[in-house]
Amino acid sequence: MGLVTVGELKPAFTGKRGFRLNSTIRHASEWPISDVSSDLTVQVGSSSFCLHKFPLVSRSGKIRKLLADPKISNVCLSNAPGGSEAFELAAKFCYGINIEINLLNIAKLRCASHYLEMTEDFSEENLASKTEHFLKETIFPSILNSIIVLHHCETLIPVSEDLNLVNRLIIAVANNACKEQLTSGLLKLDYSFSGTNIEPQTPLDWWGKSLAVLNLDFFQRVISAVKSKGLIQDVISKILISYTNKSLQGLIVRDPKLEKERVLDSEGKKKQRLIVETIVRLLPTQGRRSSVPMAFLSSLLKMVIATSSSASTGSCRSDLERRIGLQLDQAILEDVLIPINLNGTNNTMYDIDSILRIFSIFLNLDEDDEEEEHHHLQFRDETEMIYDFDSPGSPKQSSILKVSKLMDNYLAEIAMDPNLTTSKFIALAELLPDHARIISDGLYRAVDIYLKVHPNIKDSERYRLCKTIDSQKLSQEACSHAAQNERLPVQMAVQVLYFEQIRLRNAMSSSIGPTQFLFNSNCHQFPQRSGSGAGSGAISPRDNYASVRRENRELKLEVARMRMRLTDLEKDHISIKQELVKSNPGTKLFKSFAKKISKLNSLFSFSSLKPSLSGKASSESRFLFQRKRRHSVS
């Protein structure tokens, strides 16, 4: 805080100085009392000041111009920035009274000095120079002080803009923010060199939170300035989140069931929509690893949908949907449960069309990555070690698996909506490619929930729903449940039993001759590799290498799947037979399947009791078989 002391005026006016103030002026006791009557009345808003011409004319160019005619005794300053409070301080300064310049009044005094033309042209050490000195020494070097003064400038438009005070404060905030970022980076570098894992924490009075007091226009200008100065995207994201939470406090609704209970008036919706659209424009650059949290993007999208009444927010909505789609693998179920706009004619609880676009964006991005990887391989040497991006443990495949699990959970959630049409559900269920799901249990659960909630759908729709499920990817528990599920069509139950029988047969065949089975069962899937020089001439080395990689991936997956299936079979093939027999003893289909299971069981027992070449017991033979298969994978 600064204290400005004004020296005595000219000796000719060092005698008694009289004031007669209107009753509307507070703190009248602070003014010196004089027997000299006032010769000027200044009207500022609803307040009147009975003053003397000479002190004001000696320091204010505007008052001097207004009093060019000596007969004038009344002046109206209706547009004075800061109102009567700022003018009172300026008048006291003209009379030589000590006034305190601080964070709360510096903006008013600076604008008042500009409006009253209290510059050095009329008096030395005038109010304009005093306030400028305070700004340079106390305000501009501090981010927090600059933000506070900038906030006070909001009520001083257009004078604060005319004297360039707003722009200078914004530049000061941007420059100091980047300096602080550089200092923080050097501090982290010192920590890393010293081997200390402790990093400086964000202070509780972090300047980014203070920006929430600014109006939308000033806030937007500050963010644009710090972006141009190179402030990192993580900090910008935190600032945007803090400002949004403060500006829209109580308006963000995450639970779609509560959305219908909240009604905003048209003015509130308009204000909310304007804030959200501005925040979306200020978001950092789009990317698959964006610094903007998924939960924040989802909240913005929900608010855009809730407040939009037409296609006016189309670009904003598309931008948010693309951002969410780019990092969909980071989303949770709550992020994609987007409520429908209540103004529409759709009675469903969730916005299915928006989710279809979001998942499509992610899948298209996945295809673009594959093309980029294929293009990248053209310039790589065949013998060079490269990462297998399509393997189950790769980051790319891991993202696809996360998205597929998210889709299954989403389908299970929206399946409970009684107004959801079958076509919408099927469109979502068929959206993901086949390789996105290693196991189809989640999709089966969602379909079963939908059939339970919608028991009156047509048989054709029921059949189309079940066609989205890959029966070969169902687990043993899911197969057992599906075989007894009366909500499924007969074709689905038969298909499940058929593939279960095939898996049993393949597993037992592999126990007899694993190597022969592998190559016989997959010969139709893998292209024939040529070992001669003539054959290799027809295929380029790049295509041949890609084919070998694909064959190895599929072979490893098949061997791993069969190993797991065989282990489960040895433990559970007896219980499967008992469960199928108990489920419906009167059904010929299950009886016949039980008989086949018995035959397969006897065959499996016979094959396991066959003497091995080494003469060991059946348990040792199985152990030897497992060891051989493990070596074959490596």
Curated annotation (Swiss-Prot):
InterPro entries: BTB/POZ_dom (IPR000210), NPH3/RPT2-like (IPR043454), NPH3_dom (IPR027356), SKP1/BTB/POZ_sf (IPR011333). The modification Phosphotyrosine is found at Y444. Residues 542-580 form a coiled coil. It holds the Pfam family NPH3. One of its GO terms (biological process) is protein ubiquitination. Residues 38-103 form the BTB domain. Residues 205-503 form the NPH3 domain. SUPFAM superfamilies: POZ domain. PROSITE patterns: BTB, NPH3. Pathway: Protein modification; protein ubiquitination. Keywords: Coiled coil, Phosphoprotein, Ubl conjugation pathway. Belongs to the NPH3 family. The BTB/POZ domain mediates the interaction with some component of ubiquitin ligase complexes. May act as a substrate-specific adapter of an E3 ubiquitin-protein ligase complex (CUL3-RBX1-BTB) which mediates the ubiquitination and subsequent proteasomal degradation of target proteins. PANTHER family: OS12G0117600 PROTEIN. This is BTB/POZ domain-containing protein At1g03010. It comes from Arabidopsis thaliana.
